[in-house]
């Protein structure tokens, strides 16, 4: 934290200790690129961007973007976070892209845009990556409402499986633990040690 604040004026880095898991460092969004450059090129050598993810804090009207960085030379890991106003479909939260710092950010920023609606300024090709290009809304936002249909295809969020998945499950019901009923199809239980020893 002190390192970031000493290298980037206005970064306002503070340590955040969660209820569980690792602590993180929260910074001012407008200084993201400067901070990331220092973390990658400076003495801590965070050469690897492992994950970019977004979290919707609906009650607080915030979107939190997290960057998990790793330094293999220093054997260390860092969780960097920033918080953005939640906005809406016509006024998405915005933050600079870090693709020019870590190429691995390319698809991860696209996924974060697609799923939670964060606009990464300066991204070379910011478009949906999991949903169809004309999909409406952002599926991981807590107030997202799944449409009943897409291009005349029925979407069934209750079962989480389409009919082809159910039929496949019924056809392969001879597998230990699977149900023979299409309506009650369930995932196979994990194998025990004794079952895998003879394979």
Write out the residue ranges for each language-model feature:
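Terminal low-complexity/charged segments
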Residues: 1-199
């Amino acid at each position: 934290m002190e390192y970031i604040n000493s290298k980037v004026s206005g970064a306002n880095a503070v340590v955040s200790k969660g209820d569980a898991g690792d602590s993180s460092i929260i910074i001012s969004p407008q200084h993201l690129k400067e901070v990331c450059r220092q973390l990658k090129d400076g003495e801590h050598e965070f050469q690897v961007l492992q994950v970019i993810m977004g979290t919707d804090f609906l009650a607080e009207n915030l979107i939190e973007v997290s960057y998990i960085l790793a330094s293999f030379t220093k054997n260390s890991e860092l969780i960097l976070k920033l918080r953005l106003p939640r906005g809406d479909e016509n006024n998405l939260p915005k933050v600079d892209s870090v693709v020019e710092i870590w190429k691995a950010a390319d698809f991860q920023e696209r996924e974060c845009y697609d799923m939670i609606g964060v606009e990464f300024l300066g991204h070379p090709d910011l478009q949906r990556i999991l949903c169809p290009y004309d999909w409406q809304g952002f599926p991981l936002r807590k107030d997202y409402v799944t449409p009943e249909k897409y291009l005349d295809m029925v979407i069934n969020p209750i079962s989480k499986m389409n009919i082809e998945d159910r039929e496949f499950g019924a056809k392969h019901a001879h597998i230990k633990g699977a149900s023979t009923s299409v309506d009650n199809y369930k995932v196979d239980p994990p194998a025990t040690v004794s079952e895998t020893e003879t394979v």
